């Protein structure tokens, strides 16, 4: 159910051989904790550690018994493939507090489905405080679910819990038969997670450390993050998020969670081996389970670049990096198509010029960068030998030279590039998940034509 293979035989000799390696003298144990006694320092990363060789001590296992796990409640009973209806995705429920979209799709021949649910919260989760708190709460809920949903994973089901400026999202994938049971579990934990002070402190410390460590990311990675923070209204720097989270207490997080989940609007998509009956079951479940209300979807905005913006980053790294972003004039499909074609034409030429010819850096890329529904052309390079000013000059020189030589591009070459982009954009979906993702992206963009 989990893997794309089937175990059909029982190999006692192989199992015995594998078990023979489970010995006290054949164990590697790593302990990571604060205030450990160490006697050595790793020279490259300056990390203190200690190393001891010998058998490990085993305690606390006397009298332990082994038992088979209980029956897996998520094992599918119904694996019947529905008949293909040849209909496109459509909205089967349209209420102020609930939208449900459905596409019965058995093109890929498996009794699987993908369910995506956006839980709209009043005011969204777009502020610096909301983004920080939501990420911590998301991690804590996943922690409380880890043991509970493991049987679902073994039964071929999966879930993901996310957050955005609009609210929390839940996605389910796998055999459709027991997805509602898994959804019930996930929603119950999202609304009623039993959080302890110990786990709260552990995850809060870990998240703050993750955000603080973003300052140690590769320079080009930091430039991409800074671009988002600069232009997207709901994007905040890792350092700012860490500072916001630092004074938070468990009681404050619980109070925030209660307020944010007091009223919920829902947008849901069912795609795959699912029918109108499944959509109605989902609607009834959500109506019973959630405090439904008409909630406006919070949308982040992207700032217009009306003049040259220069942002200098203080990066603790020997390399220098440059990111140059040319924003589309608007968010129309026409503008996105033009910048997409420009990105395809420029990609190999930019790489060839800065990486191959000038050997300025090992990270060289030209393409498009989409922020919400607004796209633009991006030029990115990281170099161990040239400074940021030199990288900027090299990029601007490349752009000017390319513009000057534009007339040398033949009609046949241009048509070939355009045809290549069209082929890539219209490429058939390889699996159910890829098609589901396109549906979800179009709904987020409010492109109800799904083109």
Predicted region positions:
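Glycine-centered hinge/linker elements that transmit conformational signals in sensory
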Residues: 282-295
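Scaffold signal of the M16-like zinc-metallopeptidase fold and its non-catalytic homologs
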Residues: 1-10, 21, 214-263, 283, ...
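Hard-cation-handling environments
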Residues: 1-31, 37
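A structural supersecondary motif
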Residues: 142-161, 169, 323-327, 343-383
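Extracytoplasmic
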Residues: 24-26, 95-97, 110-116, 133, ...
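Buried hydrophobic packing residues in well-ordered domains
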Residues: 29, 135, 170, 186, ...
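M16/insulysin-pitrilysin zinc metalloprotease superfamily fold
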Residues: 1, 129-130, 148, 166-211, ...
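His/Glu-based metal-binding/catalytic segments typifying zinc-dependent metallopeptidases
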Residues: 1-3, 33-35, 43-136, 293-349, ...
């Amino acid at each position: 159910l989990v893997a794309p293979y089937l175990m059909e035989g029982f190999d006692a000799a192989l199992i015995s051989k594998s078990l023979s390696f489970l010995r006290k003298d054949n164990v590697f144990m790593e302990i990571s904790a604060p205030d450990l006694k160490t006697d050595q320092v790793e020279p490259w990363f300056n990390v203190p550690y200690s190393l001891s060789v010998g058998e490990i001590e085993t305690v606390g296992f006397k009298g332990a018994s082994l038992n088979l796990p209980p029956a897996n409640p998520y094992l599918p009973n119904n694996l019947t493939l529905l008949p293909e209806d040849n209909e496109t995705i459509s909205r089967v429920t349209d209420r102020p507090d609930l939208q449900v979209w459905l596409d019965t799709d058995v093109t890929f021949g498996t009794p699987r489905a993908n369910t995506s649910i956006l839980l709209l919260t009043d005011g969204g989760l777009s502020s610096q405080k909301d983004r920080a708190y939501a990420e911590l709460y998301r991690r804590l809920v996943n922690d409380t679910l880890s043991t509970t949903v493991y049987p679902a994973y073994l039964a071929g089901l999966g879930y993901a819990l996310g957050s955005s400026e609009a609210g929390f999202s839940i996605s389910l994938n796998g055999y459709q038969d027991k997805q509602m049971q898994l959804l019930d579990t996930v929603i119950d934990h999202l609304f009623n997670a039993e959080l302890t002070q110990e786990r709260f402190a552990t995850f809060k410390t870990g998240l703050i450390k993750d955000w603080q460590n973003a300052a140690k990311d590769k320079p080009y990675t930091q430039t991409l993050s800074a671009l988002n923070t600069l232009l997207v209204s709901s994007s905040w720097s890792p350092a700012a998020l860490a500072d916001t989270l630092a004074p938070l207490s468990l009681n404050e997080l619980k109070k925030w969670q209660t307020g944010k989940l007091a009223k919920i609007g829902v947008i849901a998509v069912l795609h795959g081996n699912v029918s109108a009956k499944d959509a109605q079951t989902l609607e009834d479940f959500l109506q019973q389970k959630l405090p439904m209300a008409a909630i406006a979807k919070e949308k982040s905005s992207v700032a217009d670049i009306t003049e040259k913006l220069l942002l200098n980053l203080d990066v603790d790294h020997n390399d220098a990096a440059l990111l140059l972003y040319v924003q589309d004039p608007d968010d129309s499909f026409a503008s996105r198509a033009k910048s997409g074609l420009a990105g395809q034409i420029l990609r190999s030429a930019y790489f060839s010029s800065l990486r191959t010819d000038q050997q300025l850096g090992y990270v060289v890329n030209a393409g498009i960068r989409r922020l919400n529904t607004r796209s633009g052309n991006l030029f990115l390079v990281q170099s161990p030998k040239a400074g940021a000013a030199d990288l900027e000059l090299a990029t601007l020189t490349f752009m000017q030279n390319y513009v000057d030589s534009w007339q040398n591009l033949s009609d046949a070459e241009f048509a070939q590039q355009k045809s290549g982009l069209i082929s890539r954009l219209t490429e058939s979906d390889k699996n159910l998940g890829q098609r589901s993702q396109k549906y979800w992206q179009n709904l987020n963009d409010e492109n109800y034509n799904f083109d």
